Amino acid sequence: MKKSIMILLVTVLGTALIVGLAFGQMMSKYEAIAKNELAPIGYNKYIVKYTKEKNNMGETMDDINMMDTKWKAEEGMADYMKPYLEGSCANYLREVVSLVPYLFEIFVMDNQGAVVCETDKTGDYMQGDEAKWQKSFADGMGGVFVDEVEFDDGFGTDVLQISVPVMDMGKAIGAITFGVFADKVM
């Protein structure tokens, strides 16, 4: 009996160790693409330009919250959303998605967490209350945020979000979130 329990315990612990190591290696892989492949997009002159323009619009938190309420209530695509999805910034993001096989969406946020531009309509306009913006904007310091891998019913596969700062002159002025197909990351 004791021998059976010991064998079971060793098997369970060994499996947990292997799974833990594999998960750690995957997280390292995601962190590596965040830093080496995705973070440089946060320095792109067009992304910086559009983010600075949005930051200089003078939008208050009340303005952002009103837009967020309106945005969330909208079932489809409204005319007021089109500049975020059809402008030059969004077109640039779509080009990036088309060139990187593991990406399925990108959206850029300003220094308050409001949408600057995006490839697909987000569920809300205000992202500033979410970890992806908070950790990547990091009070203007900039950081990398790799979210947990989750199964997406719509895609039928595992996905995750990776967020990096939009940087200008050594300071975070916004953030970018990338939707990533977990199984396509090499």
Predicted regions and their residues:
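Bacterial N-terminal signal peptides that target proteins for export
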Residues: M1-L9
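Bacterial N-terminal signal peptides
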Residues: L9-I18
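Juxtamembrane extracytoplasmic/periplasmic/luminal helical "stalk" adjacent to the first N-terminal
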Residues: F23-A78, Y102, K184
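Amphipathic coiled-coil signal-relay and dimerization helices
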Residues: K70, A114-T119
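Extracytoplasmic/periplasmic sensor domains and loops in membrane signaling proteins
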Residues: A78-L93, D120-E150
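Short, small/polar residue-rich loop motifs at catalytic or cofactor-binding pockets
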Residues: V100-L103, D158-L160
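Short hydrophobic alpha-helical segments used for membrane anchoring or interfacial signaling
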Residues: E105-N111
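Conserved beta-strands of PAS-like sensory domains
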Residues: T157-M186
